[in-house]
Amino acid sequence: MDKVAAVVAAAGRGSRMGTETRKQYLSLAGLPVVGHVLRAMEASSAVKSVVTVVAPGEENYFRLTVVERLGIRKVAAIVPGGEERQDSVYNGLLALAPDTGIVVVHDGARPLLSPGDINAVVQAAAAYGAATLAVPVKDTVKMAGRDGFVLRTLSREHLWLVQTPQAFRYDIIMNAHRQARQKKYAATDDAGLVELLGRPVKIVAGSYENIKITTPEDLTVAEAVIKARQGRLAEAGG
């Protein structure tokens, strides 16, 4: 398989957490949130190197408090982010080695991914060019107008909630970001930029546990998930 590298986007402000500390540095089961992400990348058999994108000026802080503290060996570069997430990911892409074949993009505030998740999207990207982890919608979804009244109910049959990691052939994701910068358009995720090129993106079924830390309640849920996982491991070992 082509050389696989990851870009971890960890430059977000996290204003909805209501804390001065950026959410990716908050403690989760004894580790920074983003530390769980890097440990999963470290355990992935597919990923060979990681570029982490952090808030400008926090590069050394990140290296000391996360990378060196946790003994992470795959981090090849720590680069400053841009004004928006899309800009930050682009900065990370620019820092990748030129012989990169497949790129994994992941949110630094999504700590519950597994090495298996990473490997699965990498395999799909190698086969199809682009892939994203996602889960089927469970709840009823309604479209509402600006007045707050329901316009219609959407069928759940073909609806998926998109997550990260997402993975792409290097040339595809670089072209998608360059086209976006040139034409000044934006998407809420990297797969969306690839879709705008008219390229197919393969869905890889993920886990409902793979939540993004956005509010204080999410931290509580994530703690519970980690404890449940530890309990299952203890039972399997005992």
UniProtKB/Swiss-Prot annotation:
> Its function?
Catalyzes the formation of 4-diphosphocytidyl-2-C-methyl-D-erythritol from CTP and 2-C-methyl-D-erythritol 4-phosphate (MEP).
- Report the PROSITE patterns cross-referenced here: ISPD
Recorded GO MF terms: 2-C-methyl-D-erythritol 4-phosphate cytidylyltransferase activity
Keywords, alphabetical:
Isoprene biosynthesis, Nucleotidyltransferase, Transferase
Give the protein family: Belongs to the IspD/TarI cytidylyltransferase family. IspD subfamily.
This enzyme catalyses: 2-C-methyl-D-erythritol 4-phosphate + CTP + H(+) = 4-CDP-2-C-methyl-D-erythritol + diphosphate
Q: Where is the signal peptide?
A: none
List the GO biological process terms. Answer: isopentenyl diphosphate biosynthetic process, methylerythritol 4-phosphate pathway
EC assignment: the record states 2.7.7.60
**Pathway participation:** Isoprenoid biosynthesis; isopentenyl diphosphate biosynthesis via DXP pathway; isopentenyl diphosphate from 1-deoxy-D-xylulose 5-phosphate: step 2/6
Record's protein name: 2-C-methyl-D-erythritol 4-phosphate cytidylyltransferase
